[in-house]
Curated annotation (Swiss-Prot):
Residues that hold ATP according to the record: 25-26, 67, 70-72, 133-135, 176, 186, 223
Protein name in UniProt: Holliday junction branch migration complex subunit RuvB
Gene of this entry: ruvB
Catalyzed reactions per annotation: ATP + H2O = ADP + phosphate + H(+)
Large ATPase domain (RuvB-L) as annotated region, ranges: 4-186
Region (Head domain (RuvB-H)): 260-353
């Protein structure tokens, strides 16, 4: 499966026109930023303090599942600081010279945004350490016995790193971030507000009930909510005179095979495979990947997080296990052996703690 082909994929859409629309509906200030109240309040405080001292903001690490607004928040930081932002990604920075070219072109207090920062090569990461800590760049000139190292002073800048896999960051890199923010899945109410705002910007007639129906199937992810809004708009324009109501949204999303929990065919296939082929688990991640013909990282990074967060799957030392919630979702009888397992509410409480 190609992840970008999923309607409820949290990764970026490859369609150029939709990317332009995405940029149009992104908030550009903390005042417009919806959800993540703790992150928003903290960043507002840190930014005001840095501006009051006429300093650059501390280096900031933003992590969390795809589609929650890490890139948007990085751009907001630059906007609120009144500086420019230069964006790149970890895989693009193949050589130290690639990073050096970006760093030497920064103005004082500018923001350098590195997406997928966990994918930086070790040799590039080594160059980043003194740049972050001392605002200096170590460059090797010459080769062989004539090679020598010189230090270039850099203007004070803010590195904003974004990652979906904070655990893959090396300790030396993680320790150099003064601000660390985790983005959580959004509530349905916040997503409904985001959908309504996007519809207003795009000029779409949308009822509050329609926005809520889209929001509750968006897997707690703004990027998915906006993508569903565009597909429901297509349905409404062809079959409902362009007006999006609750019933129109329901019909459109059912046609698109997105159920009331935000699951699509891939989610249901994963759960049913665990139930039917592995007796509910435990099952190892490699066996599960082979059974559904998926890459291991796709299951870990794309499919699992939301299913775990919603209490349909548990990770145990012996492997993945479905909860009774998964059996109930498909109308299946709960095995008697699951009577020994924690109920879903207790499991979710344990996750929250």
């Amino acid at each position: 499966m190609i992840e970008a082909d999923r309607l409820i994929a949290a990764t970026h859409s490859p369609r150029e026109r939709e990317e332009v629309q995405d940029r149009a509906i992104r908030p550009v200030s903390l005042a417009e930023y919806i959800g993540q109240p703790t992150v928003r309040e903290q960043m507002e405080l840190f930014i005001q303090a840095a501006r009051g001292r006429s300093e650059s903001l501390d280096h900031t690490l933003i992590f969390g599942p795809p589609g929650l607004g890490k890139t948007t928040l990085a751009n907001i930081i630059a906007q609120e600081m009144g500086v420019s932002i230069k964006s790149t990604s970890g895989p693009v920075l193949e050589r130290p010279g690639d990073l050096a070219a970006l760093l030497t072109n920064l103005e004082p207090h500018d923001v350098l945004f590195i997406d997928e920062i966990h994918r930086l090569s070790p040799i590039v990461e080594e160059v980043l350490y003194p740049a972050m800590e001392d605002f200096q760049l170590d460059i090797m000139i010459g080769e062989g016995p004539a090679a020598r190292s010189i230090k270039l002073d850099l203007p004070p800048f803010t590195l904003v790193g974004a990652t979906t896999r904070a655990g893959m960051l090396t300790n030396p890199l993680r320790d150099r971030f003064g601000i660390v923010q985790r983005l959580e899945f959004y509530s349905t109410a916040d997503l409904a507000t985001i959908v309504s705002r996007s519809a207003n910007i795009l000029g779409l007639p949308l009822d509050p009930e329609g926005s809520f129906e889209i929001a509750r199937r968006a897997r707690g992810t703004p990027r998915i909510a906006n993508r569903l809004l565009r597909r429901v708009r297509d349905f409404a324009e062809v079959r409902a005179k362009g007006h999006i109501t609750k019933s129109v949204a329901d019909l459109a999303l059912n046609l698109l095979d997105v159920d009331e929990h935000g699951f699509d065919h891939q989610d249901r296939r994963l759960l049913l495979t665990m139930i039917e082929k592995f007796d509910g688990g435990p099952v190892g991640i490699d066996s599960l990947a082979a059974a559904i013909s998926e890459e291991r990282h796709t299951i870990e990074d794309v499919l699992e997080p939301y299913l775990i967060q919603q209490g349909y799957i548990m990770r145990t030392p012996r492997g993945r296990v479905v909860t009774r919630h998964a059996y109930l979702h498909f109308g299946l009888n709960i095995p008697t052996r699951m009577g020994e397992m924690p109920v879903v509410d207790e499991f979710l409480d344990a996750v929250d703690d």
